[in-house]
């Protein structure tokens, strides 16, 4: 480990790593010296992120995966465990927005898909990687949330409820693992950020009026390197 590569020798895994906050966070972790496992559905998009990391002198491995498939997550956990002795950083970023609609009009099938990706997949990731996280000298789990998870907003019921449940799940995990002194949980609200999801939610918004994903990625890295407490929810403003 060196000052310019504080995560040298560490292993990180980022979900939703093909674009936006996930891609930016993966690149920031790699720039800090970590070997980053890139997880998302689209292999070609992951390869683009992998190429940028390699061109910058970093290390990355792609793992194309549909996170809505619990068995696939378990297999990924087994594959990573077979190759690496420990996991130092797990970033749970993948999510879907779904339709912004009144509660009474929420489509049950879409809501089920949304809860599967935004909540159940994250529990499955923790289940698959908890043993490997506990083998690290110090491990960090970062979960991306949203202000609507704790501040209800009209038409955001489906997405907001998934994030509210995620915050409870991760807060519970933080409480359950605090005794170890080796595993920290960070619940991160990125705030308004220039992503495809944001553009879909606010189509009339000027993209340059909100911060780029890189700002969020740098804040996440800074938190990982700091003496931050476990279970804390933080909001990242520009």
Predicted ranges, named:
Residues 44, 64-75, 108:
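The beta1-alpha1 cofactor-binding region of Rossmann-like NAD(H)/NADP(H)-dependent oxidoreductases
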Residues 78, 117-137, 175:
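Amphipathic alpha-helical dimer-interface segment in Rossmann-like NAD(P)H-dependent oxidoreductases
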Residues 11, 18-20:
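Conserved glycine-rich cofactor-binding loop
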Residues 104-123, 142, 166:
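Catalytic Tyr-X3-Lys loop
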Residues 74, 97-112, 155:
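Conserved mid-core segment of classical short-chain dehydrogenase/reductases
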Residues 32-48:
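Conserved glycine-rich Rossmann-like NAD(P)H-binding loop of the short-chain dehydrogenase/reductase
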Residues 96, 134-179, 192:
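Catalytic loop of short-chain dehydrogenase/reductase
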Residues 183, 187-188, 195, 203-238:
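C-terminal helical subdomain
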